[in-house]
Amino acid sequence: MAEFAGGVGMRSAARPTFESVYAERHTQLVRYATVLVGDRSLGEDLAQEAFLRCFSRRRPVDDPWPYLRTTVTNLAKDGFRRNGVARRAASLLRPLATDSVDGGENRTVILDAVYHLPLRQRAAVVLRFYEDCSEREIAQVLGCRPGTVKSLLSRALTTLRLEVQR
């Protein structure tokens, strides 16, 4: 058995605290949620709910970040199903475009096109290209196989190319 800082067989790091995870990941989670649902306020609500669910579990989560992303994705899917949420106007994404250093019209066009993708394709694109997740990590968040992730990304990129060329 390997020896760790805490002794033989013990984990070397304690579970992360709410405060540390919140400080490190809140902004990133809100951005992810906002791109999924197209509304900053709703994105903040989804992120808050994800943090609440993650840190109020009976059994603590060893690695909260994948759990938080999966929870936000599921909450977004549930919201679309339950409420029949209509797609918001592209103007709701414009504040995200101005958050970027490069900003500009090209980013706005791309974000608009991403927002108009079906939810699973949108989630796959955001996780891959904005969050830099691997196909395996995306599959875990979306609850599918890596092959499905490849298919989702392929279809999404084809759609995005066509939309951006318009």
What kind of region is each of these model predictions?
Residues A2-R31, S41-E44, R59:
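A short, charge-rich alpha-helical start-of-domain segment used by transcription regulators
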Residues L29, A33, L68, V72-F80:
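Hydrophobic-face residues of short alpha-helical interaction/recognition segments
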Residues D45-L52, S56, D62-N74, S151:
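Structural recognition of an alpha-helix C-terminal capping motif at a helix-to-coil junction
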Residues S56, D63, T73-S91, G103:
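Arg/Lys-rich amphipathic alpha helix in sigma70-family domain 2
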Residues T73, K77, L142-R166:
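DNA-recognition helix of helix-turn-helix
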Residues A86-V114, S134:
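Internal acidic/polar
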Residues Y115, L119, E131-T148:
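Helix-turn-helix DNA-binding module
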Residues A124-R128:
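A short pre-motif secondary-structure segment
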